[in-house]
Amino acid sequence: MTGRTLAAPVTAAQLRERIGRLPRVPLAHAPTPLEECPRFARALGTTARIFVKRDDLTGVALGGNKVRNLEFRLADALAHGADTLLLGVDILSNSARQTAAVANRHGLRCVLVLVGREPAGPPRGNLLIDRLLGAEVHYAPDVPAQQATLERLAGELAAAGRHPYVMTATPFFAQAAALAYADCTLELLGQLADLGLGAPDALYISSSGKGVAGPLLAARALGLPTRVVSVSPRDTGGAAVGAAAEVCAGAAALLGLDLGERPADHQHRDEYGPPGYGLTNPAALEAMQLLARSEGLLLDPVYTGKAVAGLIGDVRRGRVGPAEVVVYVHTGGLPLIFDHDADLLPILG
């Protein structure tokens, strides 16, 4: 915790100051642009104002939301004297790519343990970039095997005199995402203010529980009326809401914030996750095509395509009012396009 406890609501300056007390390594090209998408809105038949927060442009190995997260994660690793970063994530992970790049920038070794089967052919997408960056890549059939491999590798590295840091081994891995995206929310609020606009009526983000905790933290801390809508790349069975609340509470404790009992307006969409993680669906493909052809903005088939499909679905169901201001936080992940060329071919026209 940092200093005396502050009770919500707090000011933007107070929240920014609390975040600024935490160790952090500057990495992201921030502030990222906030772009209005009027042609996209017209294509959806709405007069709502839709903005995209371009966190696909954070820099570092094709950018994405993990660059902001890594500002806090890397600071913690360096504070622990790490010379080797170990990360256990999924085989398509954007986090793996960005972590490997950041490790190179700081002279650290990067070891990835990925859940999934090693490709029989040449690597593609994020995995190709992981290899280009020189990350040491291991594969595991499931999460228990992944954890066992991480523990074994960390032990071997320590025995060899190295200083391993298993990034996914503590709650701070998720809390760092909340801190990063509370800060990003402050950034986009400032950009909206420059346009003469207040807090958005709704904010959409791809998340299964970690990233969305940041906007939730900011909304609760500042007392914003914003609906925070997360869209998962997989069906979480409803677990994302509880996971986000837990991460939000942990991050608030680090900041010394008492958020009280007022819940943020968190809505979660699991229905765009099927047929599963790493797989796409017609709604995501439609979203990719519609945003590309109306605004020239690219989405991926696994994360951001599904998130924008959730936004499109809400507009069509009347959940977005005609006078509302909506922000979609673009979390990147564009290398995944090249894992799904066969899925994309039928919609190219």
Give names to the regions the model predicted.
Residues M1-G349:
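PLP-dependent amino-acid enzyme catalytic core
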